[in-house]
UniProtKB/Swiss-Prot annotation:
It is a multi-pass membrane protein. InterPro entries: MFS, MFS_trans_sf, NO3_transporter, NO3_transporter_NarK/NarU-like. Induction: Up-regulated after a long nitrate induction period. It comes from Chlamydomonas reinhardtii. GO terms for biological process: nitrate assimilation; nitrate transmembrane transport. The gene is NRT2.2. Keywords: Cell membrane, Membrane, Nitrate assimilation, Transmembrane, Transmembrane helix, Transport. The keyword Signal does not apply. The chain crosses the membrane at residues 38-58, 74-94, 98-118, 128-148, 158-178, 196-216, 247-265, 281-301, 323-343, 351-371, 383-403, 419-439. It holds the Pfam family MFS_1. It is found in: Cell membrane. This is Nitrate transporter 2.2.
Length: 513
């Protein structure tokens, strides 16, 4: 049952996780972690896509071709592929606070180094290293998943990630203004764009410092180091079984694939939209940046509403409802991406369709992380890292194939046609959602396996020796909370049995295992 302790102005579940997301509060540890996670993620987006915001200026100063600008964009999203996988393991070991601070501090020098680039090679290299900071996404989702109850974790994850993703739009608005302000102050244009990168670089250091000073890893109010000293966090066991649980679960790979064509599509648009509007419609940089920013800024509500819709649909329809709404929403996003490429002769139509496209695309991103926490309790960080990396892989492949164009293996299309085929690809690959099946909840088209309960699914991640040591207890508490994913029909049956009986069943199963 939910409890309200004196020091928390909101209800907690049996794991000490918040059952609400009061975004106006900064209460330790739940809401402070929430705000620190999305702010760090926001800044990683600002810095990663700041070069795309100034692409026309940088392109002219460094004498880059459009193909080279596109390939540099590919390098930016490639940087985070391995970084996200590594960060998933890292946060499972040391906690999200150190993970977030490390991501920011280790990539801040690369942001400053953008002022030193001289040609395509150095430009692409620096974008690669700045892009490593996008692994902040894993810290963001892991931290929120640690702090919020399973019934609202989709909402919490989606709001935090959505507000973080806004950085991809905000930079298109902010960076041209910073550049123009420096230039108006008397600095030559070829120097002004370089000076502009000292702003996000400095903010990286500030946000990392605040994370170390104010962040707390765990709902108990303690960090991972203290919990390990007490023995509370030995429940993770050895690292290899954790990695095996995450990478050995086929659901992780399907979600990584489909996330590559929601978040991956979003990253691709963030990389190309300003240059597209600048070239296609003859706009100046400030106007192209402001209009391009709209796509990313829709994250202020769109990704959050995706998580909310996923959580709401799960109440009557359970996990099967989450899967259905993800497939429908992401398919609609792909369809509107196709339409956007077809209306390239009209700026007004392009912007209107872009807004609709962005809403569905970003809602699908949020819906993915309404499902991800249930794939594996023991390897939540690894699964988050793999799914997050899938977003970057999708972006790298999509941009390399459709938007970078002059190599023999690349397809040389007009930019409008590139949007069309990106949408077709997204619609086709989203079909993979239909193959996700949980034995205790079912899939889009099939029901659960008779007699299988949540405890069975999460207990299989632990060996008999680990169960004997009691290392599985956290997973059993999570299994009990996750019974809410059955939907109304099974939930009424659960209510009839009662929480106590469910806890007894879990204890018996843990003993006999």
């Amino acid at each position: 049952m939910a409890t309200v302790e004196k020091k928390y102005p909101y209800a907690l579940d049996s794991e000490g996780k918040a059952k609400y997301v009061p975004v106006w509060r900064f209460t330790q540890p739940h809401m402070m972690a929430f705000h620190l996670s999305w702010i760090c993620f926001f800044m990683s987006f600002v810095a990663t896509f700041a070069p795309a915001s100034l692409a026309p200026v940088i392109r002219d100063d460094l004498f880059l071709t459009k193909s080279e600008v596109g390939n540099a964009g590919v390098s930016a999203v490639c940087g985070a592929i391995a970084a996200r996988l590594f960060m998933g393991i890292f946060v499972d070991v040391v906690g999200p606070r150190y993970g977030a601070a490390a991501a920011m501090l280790m990539t801040a020098p690369a942001v400053f180094c953008m002022a030193l680039v001289t040609d395509f090679s150095t430009f692409a290299c620096v974008r690669f290293f700045i892009g490593l900071s996008l692994c902040m996404f894993v810290c963001c989702q892991f931290w929120c998943g640690t702090m919020f109850n399973v019934q609202i974790v989709g909402t919490a994850n989606a709001i935090a990630a959505g507000w973080g993703n806004m950085g991809g739009g905000a930079c298109h608005f902010i960076m041209p203004l910073i550049y123009q302000g420096i230039k108006d102050g008397g600095v030559p244009g070829y120097q002004a764009w370089r000076w502009a990168f000292f702003v996000p670089g400095g903010i990286y250091i500030v946000t990392a410092t605040l994370t170390l000073l104010l962040g707390i890893d765990h709902p108990s109010g303690k960090d991972y180091r203290d919990l390990k000293k007490e023995g509370t966090l030995k429940a993770k066991g050895n690292m290899w079984p954790v990695i095996k649980c995450g990478l050995g679960n086929y659901r992780s790979w399907i979600l990584a694939l489909t996330y590559g064509y929601s978040f991956g599509v979003e990253l691709t648009v963030d990389n190309v939209i300003v240059e597209y509007l600048f070239d296609q419609f003859g706009l100046n940089l400030a106007v192209a940046g402001a209009l391009g920013a709209i796509f990313g800024l829709m994250n202020i509500f769109s990704r959050a509403t995706g998580g909310m819709i996923s959580d709401l649909i799960a109440k009557p329809f359970g996990m099967r409802g989450r899967l259905w709404v993800l497939w429908i929403t992401q398919t609609l996003g792909g369809i509107f991406c196709i339409i956007m490429g077809k209306v390239s002769n009209s700026l007004t139509a392009t912007i209107v369709i872009m807004i609709i496209f962005s809403i569905f695309c970003q809602q699908a991103c949020g819906m993915h992380f309404g499902i991800t926490p249930f794939v594996s309790r023991r390897a939540y960080g690894v699964v988050s890292g793999l799914v997050g990396a899938g977003g970057n892989v999708g972006a790298a492949i999509t941009q390399a194939i459709w938007f970078s164009g002059t190599a023999t293996w690349q397809i040389n299309l007009s930019r409008p046609d590139s949007f069309v085929w990106m949408g077709v690809q997204a619609v086709a690959l989203t079909v993979a959602v239909m193959f996700i099946w949980f034995p205790m909840w079912g899939s889009m088209f099939t029901g659960p396996r008779e007699g299988v309960e949540e405890e069975d699914y999460y207990l299989r991640e632990w060996s008999a020796e680990e169960v004997a040591q009691g290392l599985h207890q956290g997973s059993m508490r999570f299994a009990m909370e996750s019974k809410s994913q059955r939907g109304y029909k099974d939930k009424r049956m659960l209510d009839a049995v009662g929480e106590t009986a469910s806890a007894d069943v879990a204890a018996v199963k843990a003993t006999v295992a």
